[in-house]
C-alpha cells in the first residue's frame, strides 16, 4: 500500500484496524481499514463491505468509498485486504453523548435535526438494497459542522445478493431488534430502523435505553419498556426459536415508553414509538419516518436534501503489491 502514508491508528475492532493516512497521489486524507485475517474477516467479508459502500456512494450522510484493495503478501501466506474511505475529522456520536454532553439529553429540536440526517442516510441505504446491521452511536461520526456520517459497514449486506436466511446474531446488543434476539434469520432492513429508534431514545434521554447485560436481560428490558402484546400478535412470533422462553419468563407490563419521555411532543413520540415497534411489520421504515409530521411540520427547514445513492457496478482491485485503484 505504498500509495498511502500512514499517519496513525484511529480505531480497532473485531473486523480490523483503521488508520488515518494521506493519499500520496491526490493529497487527500483518508481512512484505511485493514481487515484482520484468520478470524472470519477474510476476502469474502472484504468484498461484501466494499460492495455495500459502493452501492451507497454519493450520499452526504454515508461514509464514501475511495478504494478497495487486496494485496498478496510477499512470500505467500495469503492476502491483506483493505478498504479506503473518506476521512471524517470528528468524534463518534457516542463520544459526543457520553463526554461532550456528559449524559445531558439533547433538546428535541437538535435530536430531530440529527435523526433527520440518520434516517435520510438509512433510507437511501435501504433504497440501494443494503442493510447496515450494526447501527449505533459508535458507528456515526460527527463532522466539524455537526453533520453526521454513518460508517463501519463491516456487518452490512446487499439484500439483492440473496434472500434469507441471514446471519444471526448481528447488531450490537443494546441496539439489536427483538426479532434478532429471539433468533430470527429471516429479518430485513427493519432491524436497522429499530437501531435508529434506540439511538433516538439515547439522544433524548442522554443514556442508552436498553443497556442489557445478556440477550435475555436485553429482551426483558425491551419488553418491560415497550410491552409484549404487540410482538405476541405477530404471525411470525411463534416460529422464532426463542419465542417460548420469552413467553414463559414472566408477566409483562404494558408499554411505559410514553412515561419515560413525557416532554417529547406527540409528533416526536409517533416517530420514536414507530421505530421501536416490536412487531417488524408495524415498525416504521426510514422513508416512512421521514414523512411523519415531526419532520414535515417542523419549524426549521430540512438540513439536507435527500440524495440518491450511486448504483455503479463495483469492480475490486486485486493485485500483488501494486497501489490500490480508486473506484
From Swiss-Prot:
Write down the Gene3D superfamilies for this protein, in alphabetical order: Phosphorylase Kinase, domain 1, Transferase(Phosphotransferase) domain 1
**One annotated Gene Ontology cellular component of this protein:** nucleus
| Entries under SUPFAM superfamilies matching the protein | Protein kinase-like (PK-like)
Q: Which GO terms describe its molecular function?
A: ATP binding; cyclin-dependent protein serine/threonine kinase activity; protein serine kinase activity; protein serine/threonine kinase activity; RNA polymerase II CTD heptapeptide repeat kinase activity
What EC number(s) has UniProt assigned to this enzyme? 2.7.11.22, 2.7.11.23
Query: What domain of life?
Result: Eukaryota
**Protein known as:** Putative cyclin-dependent kinase F-2
Amino acid at each position: 500500500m505504498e500509495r498511502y502514508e500512514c499517519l496513525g491508528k484511529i480505531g480497532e475492532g473485531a473486523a480490523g484496524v483503521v488508520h488515518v493516512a494521506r493519499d500520496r497521489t491526490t493529497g487527500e486524507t483518508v481512512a484505511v481499514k485493514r481487515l484482520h485475517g484468520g478470524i472470519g474477516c477474510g476476502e469474502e467479508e472484504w468484498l461484501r463491505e466494499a460492495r455495500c459502500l459502493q452501492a451507497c456512494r454519493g450520499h452526504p450522510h454515508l461514509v464514501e468509498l475511495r478504494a478497495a484493495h487486496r494485496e498478496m503478501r510477499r512470500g505467500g501466506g495469503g492476502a491483506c485486504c483493505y478498504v479506503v474511505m473518506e476521512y471524517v475529522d470528528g468524534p463518534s456520536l457516542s463520544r459526543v453523548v457520553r463526554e461532550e454532553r456528559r449524559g445531558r439529553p439533547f433538546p428535541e429540536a437538535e435530536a430531530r435535526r440529527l435523526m433527520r440526517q440518520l434516517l435520510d442516510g438509512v433510507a437511501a441505504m435501504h433504497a440501494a438494497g443494503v442493510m447496515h446491521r450494526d447501527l449505533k452511536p459508535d458507528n456515526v461520526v460527527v463532522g466539524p459542522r455537526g453533520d453526521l456520517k454513518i460508517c463501519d459497514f463491516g456487518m452490512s449486506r446487499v439484500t439483492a445478493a440473496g434472500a434469507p436466511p441471514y446471519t444471526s446474531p448481528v447488531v450490537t446488543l443494546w441496539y439489536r431488534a427483538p426479532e434478532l434476539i429471539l433468533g430470527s434469520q429471516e429479518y430485513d432492513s427493519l432491524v436497522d430502523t429499530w437501531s435508529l429508534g434506540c439511538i433516538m431514545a439515547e439522544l433524548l434521554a442522554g443514556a442508552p435505553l436498553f443497556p442489557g447485560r445478556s440477550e435475555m436481560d436485553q429482551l426483558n428490558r425491551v419488553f418491560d419498556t415497550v410491552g409484549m402484546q404487540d410482538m405476541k400478535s405477530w404471525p411470525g412470533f411463534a416460529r422464532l426459536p426463542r419465542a417460548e422462553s420469552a413467553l414463559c419468563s414472566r408477566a409483562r407490563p404494558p408499554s411505559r415508553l410514553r412515561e419515560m419521555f413525557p416532554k417529547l411532543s406527540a409528533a416526536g413520540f409517533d416517530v420514536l414509538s414507530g421505530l421501536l415497534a416490536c412487531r417488524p411489520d408495524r415498525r416504521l421504515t426510514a422513508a416512512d419516518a421521514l414523512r411523519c409530521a415531526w419532520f414535515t411540520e417542523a419549524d426549521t427547514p430540512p438540513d439536507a436534501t435527500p440524495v440518491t445513492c450511486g448504483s455503479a457496478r463495483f469492480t475490486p482491485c486485486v493485485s500483488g503489491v501494486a497501489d490500490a485503484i480508486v473506484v
